[in-house]
Every structure is written in C-alpha cells, then in structure tokens.
Amino acid sequence: MELLSRKTLVMVLCGGKGERLYPLTRDRAKPSVPFLGSYRIIDFSRSNALNSGLRKIALVTQYKSLSLDRHIINGWNIFHAESGDYILSISAQGRVSDSWYEGTADAVFQNIYTIQQENPDHVLILSGDHIYKADYRRLLLYAEQKDADAVIMTRTIPTAEASRFGVIGVDDERRIVEFAEKPKKPFAAPWDPSVSLISMGVYLFKTPVLVRALLKDARKAASSHDFGKDIIPSL
C-alpha cells in the first residue's frame, strides 16, 4: 500500500474564484478562505492526502493565490525533501499556452510537464474547495485490484436531488457506463431506483490514460476542457 501511495502524484485544483462566497473571496481564492479559526478550506484536501500516506502534492493555483501560498509556506512545512516528499504551488507555466486555465482539465494539461517529470503510476485529481473526510488509500487499492484506467469517488443521494451534480451510471460490477453533468433526468443506481451516484470531483487515473485524454481534449476547439463535462465522458 505504501508503494502505491509513493507512486501517486496528487494535483489539487485551487483556481476557483468562489463567487458565491463573496465578500470572503474578495482578496483570496476559495480554497484559502478561513475555516474554524486558523484553518483554511484547502486543509481538508491536504489532511485527507497526508492521512492517506500521499506525500507528492502539487497545488494548481491561479486566482488571487497569495494568501494560499503564504498558508502553504507557514503551515505545511512538514515535508522531507531528501525522501522525495513535497508540496508545492504551481501556477500556469506558459509551456503550452499563454492564457489562464480554461477549465479543470486545462489546468492539469497546462501543467502536464510536472506529471511527465514526476512520472507517477497514478495521478489523483482533487478539488481544493471541497469539505469532506476521505481515505484515498481505499481508492488506490480498488484501482489496483480492478486494474482500472480511472476511478471516480462517488456518493449516493436521492435521485430527486441529483440533477445539481455530475451523475454516474454503473453496471452490476460498478463499471462506469454513463456520465452526465447536471442532467435534467438523473439515472438511478442499479441496486436502488430511489438513489443516484454522484461524482465527488475526485478522480484517480493511470498516468498514461490521463495524459492521452488531456492531449486529445486539448486539440478540441469546442471542448470546455472540464473533467466532468469532457474528459470522463470521453473515456
């Protein structure tokens, strides 16, 4: 299990403006909004990753990132560089585009050099503005056991409420057969017609699968370059 964690790169998407939290986000990105005193929203993703044994973490920043960068420097200084552990903040590098990130997938694509340099077995994509507790080792172990190209972390909610989320359809062996972003008529889980599986925005990919999907998506002018809308449905 430790080897799986060591060969996984975590990329936390932290570029959201958080317009619905204004004025809290007037001077900072949503992931750096304070939570319970000295903590920030980003600390949930950070704690989940650390408690899952993950020690290679890249925060993909863009919008008003100074507050977040300071929090990383002052509060996350726990890594040992000599053992290959790190947490770093990366903004648009200008290697593949001079523009700001155009979507969640584009944010990772513009930093594809980081993935290629690290050369992990898996890449775990997280959102830096989600509040939840999870052990990602279960996700890694499941992917290893199934030899899965991609795994999405999900939860069940009443089907009547699912139209606000990305909804996943699976077969009896829980292989993904459908994915729809905010569908008007959400499909139900096969084991219970009253609930639907929704995406939590946590994606685990085999690195070659992710790189191919990002390169293919980047060539599509009409794409919104979003994991939920474009990358996952294309797999």
Where are these regions (language model features)?
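Unchanged
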Residues: 1-235
